[in-house]
Curated annotation (Swiss-Prot):
Belongs to the class-II aminoacyl-tRNA synthetase family. Gene3D superfamilies: Anticodon-binding domain (3.40.50.800), Bira Bifunctional Protein, Domain 2 (3.30.930.10). It catalyses: tRNA(His) + L-histidine + ATP = L-histidyl-tRNA(His) + AMP + diphosphate + H(+). This is Histidine--tRNA ligase. GO terms for cellular component: cytoplasm.
Length: 429
């Protein structure tokens, strides 16, 4: 027996009853970004594998274990993007968008791909909204990005459900000094580390700080801290960021173990976390990556950004019960037509009403059917009103207008008077 066709594991369909919440989130954020002066950029899903190997870093879990990579017909190694920053930096470089110190404030949205174990809030195809800023080196833009996300949580009604965690990773030189000290400390305790942390000792030892294994976290209690190795410039940058967040009353927690999962971060690192989604508690994360553009062959260019997971945010909206009820509003009007002349008139009237009443949700019966069956479909649609057109109505240029959600009587309304009458009824309903 042939296997029935199904979606690939971890790659989910977003069904019609789910998409209103997605559109609400995306629309709310797009409006907020527009108000802050950010411009949308649309990026390819496929990139050369080298882009991510160089940008994210060899030895990271993303590059070593999670990327969807294949050879095309020309033997080129291509990868389905696992994150958006590297592709955005590539586009900025390729098109000269940051040349001459030009400030760029960009945002994007779309699917990302990682071969992970699918679970609630974690998928192999997942969606992100990302923001990237180039050529602004100070803590003021770091603060703007964090405040921007804070405003989004307020608009969505979830501000009390998320907490900002903040850290500074210092300069690359400071991290190198700290890495050496951390490795020396852990080397003496190597056999006590979990297997994953042992592997990271040679690839990305700072990621051990983020281990979820309790025994490893216990070993880290006496470990040296990154803040003891910070350079003065990074300390001043971090203090400037905190001062700006304090000025607007934005509360945060300092988490010295917050290192982010990608190698390109420096100085500011932040995450918004929640305790409402179980293990998948990070809903937004980002930070500064001042060396990434030059790592890709460009001139030294300050960069900072963040990404948020759409699936997790929608799940949090659902968990908190803050999705506006009107997102799933039913149709305003259902048009029933009996006979070909009535069907033609229904089509004409429907288009006139759509022009006269912007935003109206209007359904015209399709597939003919008896009076009884059309009325049944009108009721099932959830529409508030029904229009009825038959031979007599067409001959007299009137419609039957019937409320479906209360006990109101059916009325006969002239075609010319219909837009005004319907608009008044919708305003009262």
């Amino acid at each position: 027996m042939s296997k029935s066709l199904q979606a690939i594991r971890g790659m989910n369909d977003i069904l019609p009853e789910q998409t209103p919440a997605w559109r609400y989130l995306e629309r709310t954020f797009a409006g907020l970004l527009d108000g802050y002066g950010y411009s949308e950029i649309r990026l390819p899903i496929l990139e050369f594998t080298e882009l991510f190997a160089r940008g994210i870093g060899e030895g990271t879990d993303v590059v070593d274990k999670e990327m969807y990579t294949f050879l095309d017909r020309n033997g080129e190694s291509l990868t389905m993007r696992p994150e958006g920053t590297a592709g955005c930096v590539r586009a900025v470089l390729e098109h000269g968008l940051s040349g001459g110190g030009q400030v760029q404030k960009l945002w994007y949205t779309g699917p990302m791909f990682r071969y992970e174990k699918p679970q609630k809030g974690r998928y192999r195809q997942f969606h992100q909204i990302g923001v990237e800023v180039f050529n602004l080196p100070g803590p003021d833009i770091d603060a703007e990005l964090i405040i921007l996300t804070w405003r989004l949580w307020q608009k969505l009604g979830m501000a009390d459900a998320v907490t900002l965690q903040l850290n500074t990773l210092g300069s690359s030189e400071a991290r190198a000094r700290y890495r050496e000290a951390l490795v020396a400390y852990l080397q003496e305790r190597f056999e006590q580390l979990d297997e994953d942390s042992q592997r990271r000792m040679t690839t990305n030892p700072l990621r051990i700080l983020d281990s979820k294994v309790e025994s490893t976290q216990a070993l880290l209690v006496g470990a040296p801290t990154l803040h003891d190795y910070l350079d003065e410039e990074s300390i001043a940058h971090f203090e400037g960021l905190k001062a700006r967040l304090d000025a607007v009353g934005l509360r945060y927690e300092i988490n010295q173990k917050l290192v982010r999962g990608l190698d390109y971060y420096c100085r500011t690192a932040f995450e918004w976390v929640t305790d409402k989604l179980g293990a998948q508690g990070t809903v937004c994360g980002g930070g500064r990556y001042d060396g990434l553009v030059s790592q890709f062959g460009g001139k030294p260019t300050p960069g900072v950004g963040f990404a948020m997971g759409v699936e997790r945010l929608v799940l949090l909206l659902e968990t908190l019960g803050v999705i506006p009820a009107e997102l799933n509003r039913p149709a305003d009007l259902y048009v029933c037509a009996f006979g070909e002349p009535a069907e033609l008139a229904a089509l004409t009237l429907a288009e006139q009403l759509r022009s006269a009443i912007p935003g109206i949700r209007l359904l015209v019966n399709a597939g003919a059917g008896s009076f009884k069956s059309q009325f049944k479909k009108a009721d099932k649609s959830g529409a508030r009103f029904a229009l009825i057109l038959g031979e007599d109505e067409v001959a007299n240029r009137v419609v039957g207008f019937k409320p479906l959600r209360d006990e109101g009587e059916q009325q006969s309304i002239a075609w010319d008077a219909l837009p005004e009458h319907l608009a008044a009824c919708l305003e009262q309903a």
